[in-house]
């Protein structure tokens, strides 16, 4: 369902916003039938992502909420990332049902809710990663200068997280407003129904997502890390700062790894948006297959972060083992 993957390839409504590289014009009479291998592979891949994501993010939430020593500033942001991923994987079965049934059976309220959750997933990851990058900027710079970051507390991190959720809610609200049920080729679909001219509004929605969901947060993150590297080059670390730097290196590595995986999963989708805005690709089986691959890659981001925590965070591994052993004892 990515950036409304509730929409089908090749459908006639020019408000198409799904994961597809091209947008069909209004004269297309019917959607192209999916190749049989793709019709089988897509729900299987979505199902695996859903199962792995639910299990992994549930484990992350369990550890972070039940272990007192895991209540750190960085983990507040990781907790919110896990909540966003968990919400998305919880509604992914509805996407799978929509794909298999080829129609929307869940009503308009659920349509608006699923569209909103989908958009939360699109925007929240990079927004929280921008906040985590800003936090790393302050911590690493303060470490290099042998000082503490004033006001960096667990409570402050929670307040910032609430502010991020409020901002994301404002950003995704237009999608929920435009989402509604519409009859297309005799089937009821959950789609974005834009005012006239639809083509203009469709392009505006894709540009809106590209700028607010990718260009601004990624530019902010890049600016933070470039500025940090330039500042560090000008600072001579003393022995105390070097010791602190080594102690905090794993946390910084974890944040950078989460960011790298997020960009790997989301960049192809946003590049496809540029293609959709600048070209008029036909809805061929190849284009549809590439589009579903891009969608699946963006979905996969919701199940990969727990593996990063398990491999890169010793505290997370220890806490998870202790909680599991306590439950089985």
Swiss-Prot record:
GO terms for cellular component: neuron projection; plasma membrane. GO terms for biological process: G protein-coupled receptor signaling pathway; neuropeptide signaling pathway; regulation of metabolic process. PROSITE patterns: G_PROTEIN_RECEP_F1_1, G_PROTEIN_RECEP_F1_2. The chain crosses the membrane at residues 40-63, 75-99, 115-134, 160-179, 205-226, 251-275, 286-300. Disulfide bonds join 111-190. Glycans are attached at residues 3, 13, 25. It is a multi-pass membrane protein. The keyword Transmembrane helix applies. This is Neuropeptides B/W receptor type 1. It comes from Rattus norvegicus (Rat). The gene is Npbwr1.
